[in-house]
A protein has these predicted regions:
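Active-site signature of alpha/beta-hydrolase-fold catalytic machinery across serine-
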Residues: 62-63, 67, 202, 597, ...
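Conserved beta-strand elements of the Class I
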Residues: 75-77, 101, 252, 276, ...
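PRPP-dependent phosphoribosyltransferase catalytic core
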Residues: 486, 501, 505, 669-693
């Protein structure tokens, strides 16, 4: 065939394409890169490529696209999991002269525009997320056009296709059905840097038994790894601000939660360091600005969740520090592998905290919905004649909306429900059986991965060898540069004054209580019935005040004087539009003395009168047992009233409404509404701690 000769007789064409892609006139192929390209272009194989981070997997499919398009194949379809990865790949592809279009939540290109360009053969590379395959409009409009003249299909981070993998995504399983519809002889490429043999065999099964696996050594030369156990968050914050300035170049600090990203970033900025935040809740513009600043070296520290994860291409990252432990060795290898792709030396430091286990076990427990939860969703769908939204289902079942979406997504992938438009769902005729054993097996594997991560932290052997063995690569005996190989532990030197400042910082991370604008039925709450913006002192269970709140509520039956003083300090720093003239509180059936005692002591310190004026009209269930907003709102609707014996001041002024815990804000909303209707002009909600996720 002509294309065979094209590749074998003109190897300089491949090399020239690579040099154009990288922008380096002396660039050459890494070992096995040329073979991978020939596998796709010459033999038109299905190839699974397992190579270390920074090896150049994207170069393989960009060069292959360049050649295959020259031979008359259709546009390459690149399925990529993260926006940061998409942006990196699009920039690189355009350097090679590939005409690229991306369809995602941030792109301006519409589906109809993409369809027009495919029909006109004006696009070489189509970049989509796996979730886009679930969009009915995309499936009905774009996929038939791609199927009419298919080209190379690339599944980036192919380990996501396997539910044994650490980052399984249900939408990736749609890809298997897509590939089964393709004719023989069509090249398909799956790429990953983080997959052991079990995950690869599962991925190979879904890509086809004929798929070829090319696996390289996963050792990251020059990356010096180390572990430091600092259970206390204040110690870790002080360590970051003291030691990161001594690290060469720019780098990443990974956190497990968005809240920790915000807290760590603020601490570093307050300490005078050049740091920015990065997580999924930020705008696309803010994330792109942060990516670019890290890429051009103008940013020292990017504090990030896994939203900055797979495939982020920055060869000059000098260090990666984990503020908390990831859930698996595989995930850690992937994240720490961001460091030092093009550097002689780089660092990876794992800081282990006391909260790590609780956070990671929560992730494991939330990963798969229970059988009862799924059947409740199916019961709602079975009872409806018309397609329904997530919010409509949430009004009928006591489940978090995010969990309902997760359930629907899994059922949609399984063909048990069908997405109608972009927002509604309906039941299909397909039967469904809960995969009890499979779910249990995966939960067991996740727990064993967590145990393996603990073993990594405790290991006295080579750190890099531990990681690569976990990925079934036994090629490395010892790296010679990690803390264990060199016998030089990660410095735990801390300034006691800085630790004290970090403790105070954590205790002053007041949170905002946003007023609700709608009631439990979705109707607008009139302005004259709404609470004002409020505050909470801390997060439930956090180091410092959070732990004191937990102890006071669950063990002591009384909140410590330190908490009362901290609340008073919070109020003193509050920039009220109208100063409060009194304090009142939320009554409780289960702890009738706990909050009144807190309110009385706070009012005394503030020098304000205590208004003992609210009462419960009925017993309500604990709000923590209500899983979504609709149920939480209905649970407390009409549950508060003014005591008939209440004595109010002649002239009503702004008042503080105090509770110990805030979660959904519905309790404060309903009680505050009663106070507003009685004539209080402003109600400031105040709580000791928030338990909101």
């Amino acid at each position: 065939m002509w294309h065979v000769a094209y590749v074998k007789e003109s190897p300089d064409v491949l090399l020239q394409a690579l040099r154009t892609l990288t922008g380096k006139p002396t660039a050459d192929f890494h070992p096995s890169q040329r073979e991978a390209i020939e596998s796709l272009v010459t033999r038109r194989e299905r190839l699974i490529l397992v190579q270390r981070t920074g090896w150049g997997k994207s170069a393989v499919y960009f060069v292959a696209t360049h050649l295959l398009r020259s031979e008359g194949l259709g546009a390459t379809l690149l399925i990529s999991p993260l926006l940061s990865l998409m942006r990196n790949q699009i920039d690189a592809a355009e350097r090679l002269g590939l005409r690229t279009l991306s369809i995602n939540t941030d792109s301006e290109t519409t589906i109809s525009e993409l369809a027009t360009q495919i029909e006109a053969d004006d696009v070489d590379l189509i970049v989509i997320s796996p979730e886009r395959l679930a969009n009915p409009e995309f499936a009905d409009t774009v996929m038939p056009l791609i199927g009419r003249r298919p080209g190379l299909t690339v599944i980036d981070e192919v380990h996501c296709i396997s539910d044994w993998g650490h980052d399984f995504r249900p939408d990736y399983q749609r890809i298997g059905r897509l590939l089964n519809s393709y004719p023989e002889g069509l090249p398909i490429l799956g790429c990953t840097a983080t997959a052991n043999k079990r995950v690869m065999e599962d991925a190979r099964r879904q890509l086809g038994d004929a798929a070829v696996v090319q696996r390289g050594a996963l050792v990251r030369n020059g990356l010096a790894l180390g572990v430091l156990k600092l259970p206390n968050q204040a110690d870790r914050l002080a360590w970051l601000s003291a030691h990161i300035p001594t690290f060469q170049g720019s780098g990443i600090v990974y956190c497990l939660t968005t809240r920790d990203v915000e807290s760590v970033t603020k601490w570093l900025v307050d300490a005078g360091l050049n740091a920015r935040r990065y997580h999924s809740r930020l705008s696309s513009q803010e994330k792109q600005e942060a990516e670019q600043e890290l890429l051009n070296g103008s940013l020292k520290i990017l504090v990030a969740t896994t939203a900055l994860g797979m495939g982020y291409d920055n060869p000059a990252i000098g260090f990666v520090v984990h503020f908390q432990s990831p859930g698996s060795v595989v995930q850690y290898y992937q994240q720490v592998g961001r460091a030092g792709r093009a550097l002689q030396q780089s660092r990876g430091v794992l800081l282990c905290g006391s909260e790590d286990e609780d956070i990671l076990m929560w992730f494991i427990d939330e990963a798969f919905p229970g059988e009862l939860q799924i059947r409740e969703v199916l019961d709602v769908l079975d009872a409806e004649e018309q397609p329904v939204t997530v919010h409509q289902i949430g009004a009928s079942v006591n489940m978090k909306l995010g969990l309902i979406e997760h359930v629907l997504n899994q059922l949609d992938v399984a063909g048990v429900v069908r997405r109608v438009g972009w927002q509604k769902y309906e039941r299909t005729l397909a039967t469904w059986t809960y995969p009890t054993e499979h779910v249990a097996d995966i939960a067991r594997i996740r727990r064993s991965e967590l145990a393996q991560m603990r073993a990594y932290a405790d290991s006295d052997g080579c750190r890099m060898a531990f990681l690569t063995r976990a990925l079934d690569d036994d090629s490395l005996a010892a790296c010679g540069i990690c803390d264990n190989c060199t016998g030089t532990p990660v410095s735990r030197e801390l300034d006691p004054d800085e630790v004290q400042q970090a403790s105070q910082f954590l205790n002053e991370q007041y949170g905002e209580i946003k007023p609700r604008a709608k009631d439990a039925h979705g109707k607008r709450i009139p302005e004259n019935e709404r609470i004002a913006e409020g505050r909470y002192l801390c997060r439930w269970g956090d180091a410092g005040y959070g732990e004191l709140v937990r102890r006071g509520k669950q063990t002591d039956g009384r909140f410590a004087d330190e908490l009362v003083a901290a609340l008073a300090q919070l109020v003193a720093r509050w920039n009220f539009e109208l100063a409060p003239v009194g304090v009142t509180y939320i009554p409780s059936d289960r702890h009738p003395l706990l909050v009144p005692d807190l309110a009385e002591r706070l009012a005394r310190i503030l020098g304000l009168p205590l208004f003992d004026i609210l009462e419960k009209t009925r017993r309500v269930e604990p709000q923590k047992t209500m899983a979504n907003s609709a149920h939480q709102g209905r649970n407390v609707e009409g549950a508060f009233a003014l005591r008939s014996s209440s004595v109010l001041p002649v002239e009503l002024g702004p008042v503080i409404l105090l509770d110990d815990i805030v979660d959904s804000r519905w309790t404060l909303t309903e009680a505050g509404r009663v106070l507003r209707l009685e004539g209080f002009p402003t109600v400031y909600p105040l709580a000791l701690a928030s338990t909101a996720q």
